[in-house]
């Protein structure tokens, strides 16, 4: 699975794992949207932590899906970002490595952010 949720003391730790850079492809976007909806519906969950598997938080868009039908399927990254911003549970982005482009946008949508030493954040589009 591209997205897994682990419960730890009332916190939903949502890990997205789409090697090599945790690209935000359709499976990851769907998994994140579903995990956020489930956390918001569960009164026992007090907060959500978003983190990437491996060395990257997220490298942004999944270039393997460029110019394919999957790229335009819902939910869009904008939809996922809106879900993070409007979550009734506090969301913390645990930036475990590099966060680029849409990956940084996802982290910025969270209510809180923490980063490991040596992690990089940047917008290559700028």
Predicted regions and their residues:
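Beta-strand-connecting loop/turn residues
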Residues: 9-10, 55, 119
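Alpha-helix capping and helix-loop boundary segments enriched in small/acidic/polar residues
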Residues: 23, 67-71, 95-98, 126
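Glycine-rich beta-to-alpha active-site loop
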Residues: 84-126
């Amino acid at each position: 699975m591209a997205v897994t949720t682990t419960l730890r003391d009332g916190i939903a730790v949502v890990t997205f794992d789409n090697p090599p850079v945790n690209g935000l492809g359709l499976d990851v976007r769907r998994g994140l949207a579903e995990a956020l909806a489930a956390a918001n519906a569960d009164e026992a969950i007090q907060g959500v932590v978003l983190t990437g598997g491996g060395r990257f938080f997220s490298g942004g868009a999944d270039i393997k899906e460029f110019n394919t039908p999957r790229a335009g399927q819902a939910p869009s990254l904008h939809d996922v970002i809106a879900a993070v911003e409007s979550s009734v549970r506090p969301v913390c982005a645990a930036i475990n490595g590099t966060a680029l482009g849409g990956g940084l946008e996802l982290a910025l949508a969270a209510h809180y952010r923490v980063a490991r030493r040596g992690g990089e954040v940047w917008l290559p589009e700028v």
